[in-house]
Amino acid sequence: MKPLKLAATLGGVVTLGLAGPAVAAQAVAPHASPVVGHVYVNDNTAAGNTIGGFDRHADGSLTPEAGSPYATGGNGSGAGTASQGALQETPDGRFLLAVDAGSDQISVLRLSGSGVPHRVVGGTVSSHGSSPVSIAITAWGRDDLVYVANAGDPTNGYSGGNYTGFELDRAGILHHIAESTVAVPDGSQLGDVLFNSTGTSVVGTRVATSLVDSFNVGRNGLLYAAPGSPYAAQGPGPLGSEFRPTNPNQLFVSNAHGGPNNGTISAFSVSRNGSLTSIGAGPFADNQTAPCWVEISHDGRFLFTTNTAVPSISRYSIAPNGSMTLIGSTALDPTTQKGPIDLRLSPGGQKLYVVDGGAATISAFRVSGGTLTPLAGAPVTVPGSVAPAGIVVD
């Protein structure tokens, strides 16, 4: 399968990485700061996909886990997935779910008490589509409800894209839900699929046609299109999306393809029936190029977006009604941070971790309100990957 590409809107296309060889697990030296959590990255390697695992220390620094990287059982694409959510953790923290975009599969890995991922026997299954790029998970009774966005075949104009549902049981096995597949027109190029915090709504982005899908989730786990869906994204190239943690009825979408210094973030109000309406004077200017991925502070007051083509991170404050004010942008070092993509906050919200698809690194920042301060020792290299996609922080 040919690599997916991410339009950087700078007169062409930027491909975030080529396939590289896997590397053996490395010995890890003792670290003075105690381990308080972990960071995982989907390495997206073509010849046998792996997950990179890092110990996260109290000072925010990262060290590779002794056994990292960990095989998923499928194959990555070897290049950027142009998506948000290529790696996810279940709400109870027991499993990681990864897209294997090169083999059209999803893999499940069980997390040990010490944070080490282990492949689940029978845990690699068909995604029921071509080029899975994004995963959404919500609690569903004793199990979890999972939806995957299949971008479509990149060698054939992103044909065959769809959203498909699964039930993840307590043993870590994915079961396809009959009649759950929702097809999208050829050429849509899905970039994200996302549940709201209550698990009652699902949204997805169509990058190539600048549309946002909105669905209501039935008791049977099936998706039902909201009235008027899909909706105009209000900007070209919607890619990343995030519901406000403090308000599941507010949705924010990054528009990546507006051109140089013309990126935007859209803000939507989500009604009870799933319909989307614009908030305030949206879309809100980014004044940067290719804002692709979105993260919102746990208190819902600030939004961060990575500008992949610059590279930089834009910072917004969010008003109670969902309108936004651009605070500024944090410039990144283009020699070590060539293409920032997915980003996630630590559980306490005091650290922000950004995976770089161009340099195969992870950057780390201290967060104080809407201010970002780079942490000493970052970025760190993602061993064995030249095209990482997706990040989990726990």
Residue ranges with predicted function:
Residues 357-394:
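Blade-level signature of beta-propeller repeat domains, shared across WD40, Kelch, NHL, RCC1
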Residues 54-62, 109-117, 165-174, 214-223, ...:
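Short loop/turn segments immediately following beta-strands, especially the blade-tip
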Residues 44-46, 56, 101-102, 111, ...:
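Short loop/turn segments immediately following the C-termini of beta-strands
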Residues 48-52, 105-107, 156-164, 211-214, ...:
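Structural motif
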Residues 34, 72-92, 127-143, 154, ...:
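Beta-rich, blade/repeat-based domains predominating
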Residues 1-27:
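Secretory targeting and sorting signals
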Residues 66-78, 120-126, 177-184, 224-232, ...:
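A short beta-strand motif characteristic of beta-propeller blades
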